[in-house]
């Protein structure tokens, strides 16, 4: 008969006296939390690295447009393409670059000029799609426009993963987790990192959005994002079961955490500490989350600003308003995903829906943050995982077309939080196919965001598998000074 493992021995040898002694300080902490009183141990940043220099941004709201928005239909104006309608993309432009399997077999690569009206917005003269984004255009001088981002990934899963974690391979911490790890929490009653998944009105071709995109990877698990659902309970199982009062729930958590503390002393697994913190956070969120999600305190003026959709849980407008409320309550990093930007076909039928979803809420979010004095230290980011091709995928008419994936150039924008408003950075060729001025790799983008949060991207690291791991990886990355206010 085999002998019990040391793990089992540790548990068999625990006595009631040890249990009580080991857990007594946790009982006090949970009791304080149940009474709504602060607990200095719980309020601490618990090992946060702290900034290397004074940050310009205290928090981030990252609006990720899943699928890859078409840059030449939104922010990268190419009027000369009108003369190229239905002509083949020159090989001198393509330069043998990799294509997806969805278009690599096409006999032709016919140019599809954008059908939308562009005009200059703001004093900065940003040429953008004012037909579909009239409200966002009003903020042109407060926005830092980036038209020369590029990446290596040509398919959604690796591209989204790279955009969020700095690497196409899954299992790395995402940007929100690095922000949580570096800066810690500002509110003991809410997570440092929250994720909202908005539901688009048009759902023709949505991409999978999985929880690994807000994983902490090899960082301690407490830095993972907490996803809020758009209907019913925002977080599953956070409320007490029917018939179970707070006092009993609190005692249950006290007992569980005392056992976890004993386990930690015996085994030393740091994730046990994470589990303790998660139980405590969940208990405190029973009070904080209902208040957060109750929009009855918002004024008529606020709903007039964001639009009626802001009252509909799960809409992008509602998510934008929730992002402001989360930021206002001290959440460090709010990640909002908006799906269905993967326009392989029917751009004219889908792009207007997408822009109607985001145009007014994006304007409203920037205006709302500004009115509340929060925009200067809140960095707002908008963009996807790659761009689209100037040539049409599938059928082409002057009124409709599709576009394939294009990682060689795409557009994004930032506002607030130390980003330089009115800047137009980067330039692509006449076909929006290659970058001709100021290339901006996603590593440089990540380094710049970390800089705005107060971190040297080379010094913000975490020891894992014997290496000092970091968001920007081992390849060279630069902070782009031209993007900084």
Predicted feature locations:
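Ligand-binding pockets and gating/stacking loops
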Residues: 1-485
């Amino acid at each position: 008969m085999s002998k019990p493992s040391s793990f089992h021995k540790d548990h068999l040898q625990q006595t009631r006296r040890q249990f009580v002694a080991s857990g007594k300080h946790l009982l006090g902490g949970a009791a304080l939390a149940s009474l709504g009183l602060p607990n200095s141990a719980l309020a601490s940043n618990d090992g946060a690295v702290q900034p290397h220099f004074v940050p310009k941004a205290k928090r981030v709201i990252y609006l990720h447009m899943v699928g890859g928005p078409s840059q030449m239909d939104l922010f990268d104006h190419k009027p000369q393409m009108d003369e190229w309608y239905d002509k083949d993309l020159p090989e001198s432009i393509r330069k043998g670059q990799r294509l997806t399997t969805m278009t690599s077999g096409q006999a032709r690569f016919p140019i599809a000029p954008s059908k939308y009206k562009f005009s200059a917005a703001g004093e900065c003269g940003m040429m953008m799609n004012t037909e579909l984004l009239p409200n966002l255009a009003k903020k042109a001088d407060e926005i830092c426009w980036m038209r020369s981002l590029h990446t290596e990934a040509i398919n959604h899963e690796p591209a989204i993963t790279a955009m969020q974690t700095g690497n196409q391979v899954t299992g790395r911490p995402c940007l929100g987790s690095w922000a949580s790890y570096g800066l810690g929490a500002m509110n003991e009653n809410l997570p440092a990192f929250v994720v909202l998944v908005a539901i688009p009105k048009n759902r023709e071709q949505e991409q999978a959005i999985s929880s690994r995109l807000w994983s902490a990877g090899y960082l301690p698990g407490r830095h993972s994002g907490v996803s809020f659902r758009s209907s019913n309970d925002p977080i599953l199982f956070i409320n007490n079961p029917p018939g179970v009062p707070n006092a009993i729930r609190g005692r249950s958590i006290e007992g569980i955490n005392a056992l976890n503390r004993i386990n930690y002393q015996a085994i030393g697994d740091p994730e046990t500490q994470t589990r303790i913190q998660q139980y405590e956070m969940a208990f405190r969120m029973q009070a904080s989350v209902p208040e957060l999600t109750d929009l009855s305190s918002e004024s008529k003026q606020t709903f007039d600003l964001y639009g009626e959709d802001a009252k509909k849980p799960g809409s992008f407008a509602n998510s934008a308003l929730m992002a402001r409320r989360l930021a206002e309550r001290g959440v460090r990093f709010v990640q909002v995903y908006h799906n269905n930007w993967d326009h392989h076909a029917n751009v004219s039928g889908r792009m207007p829906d997408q822009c109607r979803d985001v145009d007014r809420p994006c304007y409203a979010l920037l205006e709302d943050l500004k009115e509340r004095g929060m925009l200067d230290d809140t960095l707002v980011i908008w963009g996807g995982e790659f761009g689209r091709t100037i040539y049409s995928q599938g059928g082409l008419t002057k009124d409709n077309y599709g576009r394939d994936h294009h990682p060689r150039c795409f557009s994004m924008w930032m506002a607030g939080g130390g980003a330089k408003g009115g800047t137009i950075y980067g330039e692509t060729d006449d076909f929006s196919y290659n970058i001709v001025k100021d290339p901006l790799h996603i590593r440089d983008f990540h380094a710049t965001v970390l800089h705005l949060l107060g971190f040297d991207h080379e010094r913000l690291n975490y020891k894992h598998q014997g290496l000092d791991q970091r968001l920007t990886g081992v390849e060279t990355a630069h902070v782009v000074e031209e993007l900084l206010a």
